[in-house]
């Protein structure tokens, strides 16, 4: 189940491999930066690429629901926070562009160009846009949020609403 849709669990096969990435001798001959680079590389993965390459079909009729939580900027019109999802579709409420998520985890525009068939490419495009906004001193985000406390590990307690502001001054 992807982190953006925990409410509807999926029955998908899970595969993992434990591998030794460095020996004691290799570690002794490396700097901390080199060791960290090897660790970062070994922990890098792409679930969508793995799904496609291994033919893992996810056929649930709700497979795209919640995807708008991570793919929040429309690549067709550039508007942020107007994406929505339902069933197998992701769509922009601002310009109407719609994408269908196939059973191999790829996106296809229902009309016109498919800007990003591979979900991580869309996500990285958004990250690049945010990075450019930060570097230009233009980044800002503001939203009303629900605030909870977790005094015990088994239940959140609602505390109320708050205004979250993230910009160069805050």
Residue ranges and their predicted role:
Residues 90, 169-170:
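Hydrophobic residues embedded in beta-strands of well-ordered beta-sheets
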Residues 1-29, 33, 37, 58-78, ...:
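A cross-family acyltransferase "interaction/gating" segment
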Residues 49-57:
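Mid-sequence helix-capping/hinge segment at a functional interface
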Residues 8, 12-28, 32-46, 63, ...:
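Rieske [2Fe-2S] iron-sulfur-binding subdomain
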Residues 38-46, 95-106:
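Short secondary-structure transition/capping segments
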Residues 62-63, 80-82, 160-165:
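Short linear motifs in intrinsically disordered
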Residues 82-87, 102-105:
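Short Cys/His-rich "knuckle" micro-motifs
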Residues 100-169:
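Long, charge-rich boundary regions
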């Amino acid at each position: 189940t992807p982190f953006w849709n925990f409410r509807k669990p999926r029955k998908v096969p899970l595969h993992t491999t434990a591998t030794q990435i460095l020996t004691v001798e290799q570690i002794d001959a490396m700097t901390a930066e080199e060791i960290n680079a090897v660790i970062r590389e070994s922990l890098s993965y792409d679930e969508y690429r793995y799904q496609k390459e291994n033919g893992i079909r996810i056929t649930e009729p709700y497979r795209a629901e919640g995807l708008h939580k991570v793919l929040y900027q429309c690549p067709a019109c550039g508007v942020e926070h107007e994406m929505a999802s339902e069933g197998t579709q992701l769509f922009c409420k601002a310009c109407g562009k719609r994408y269908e998520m196939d059973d191999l985890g790829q996106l296809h525009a229902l009309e016109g160009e498919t800007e990003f068939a591979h979900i991580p490419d869309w996500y990285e495009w958004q990250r690049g846009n945010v990075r450019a906004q930060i570097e230009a001193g233009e980044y800002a985000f503001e939203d009303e949020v629900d605030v909870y406390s977790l005094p015990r590990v088994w239940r959140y307690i609602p505390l109320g609403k708050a205004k979250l502001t993230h910009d160069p001054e805050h």
